[in-house]
Amino acid sequence: MNNLKRLTKTIFSCFTLSALLLLAGCETLPPMTDLSPITVTDARQATAWELQGKLAIKTPDDKLSANIYWRHSKDRDELTLTTMLGTTVLTLNSTPNSAHLHIDGKDFRDDNAQRLLERVSGWSIPLADLPLWITGQVGPNDQVIARDSQGKPKQLTNTQTPPPWQVAFLSWQSQSGASVPHQLKLERGDLQLKLQLNQWQALGKPAILVGEQP
């Protein structure tokens, strides 16, 4: 059984179990207590954010759909995939120098999150570039192929590793005061990812009022 089929089976099993248990045992990420929701006028102003949405992964042999929850900051990332009923089936927690993946009751570790995810799941997902694309930004290895009438990227090619990633920004939305993508489609060879951001929240340090102790 290939890795994607194994993960698909895991998600289906968790979905069935959660239906029987009426959501008993659902897991959630601990809150980032040092960060609070903020409003920005440009997504580039947010050094940290969290999102909720849906992720679809498709290969010639299989396909997978899951809810995605992602908290991102410059120091760490916390990514979770769940069934439609909310049961956690995969968590990936990482810092610039370490990564921990929990899936199917097993724990895996590496010093690189992207390499770890590819080794265990078989997915070559550009985790280092996704935070830029999720906020509508373009990286140094990205070549913009087309822009919309407002100058936002509509399609780009990432040339860092062959074959290149083709990224399409299908729609945009206003979240936390900024314009961010609503739907993204990523293609590389025979691997296709679709990401829908249902909620994107910019995060920052809580403001300290005059007279309060820091």
Curated annotation (Swiss-Prot):
The keyword Transcription does not apply. InterPro entries: LolA/LolB/LppX, OM_lipoprot_LolB. Keywords: Cell outer membrane, Chaperone, Lipoprotein, Membrane, Palmitate, Protein transport, Signal, Transport. It comes from the Bacteria. Residues 1-25 form the signal peptide. Plays a critical role in the incorporation of lipoproteins in the outer membrane after they are released by the LolA protein. GO terms for cellular component: cell outer membrane. The keyword Membrane applies. A lipid is attached at C26 (S-diacylglycerol cysteine). One of its GO terms (biological process) is lipoprotein localization to outer membrane. This is Outer-membrane lipoprotein LolB.
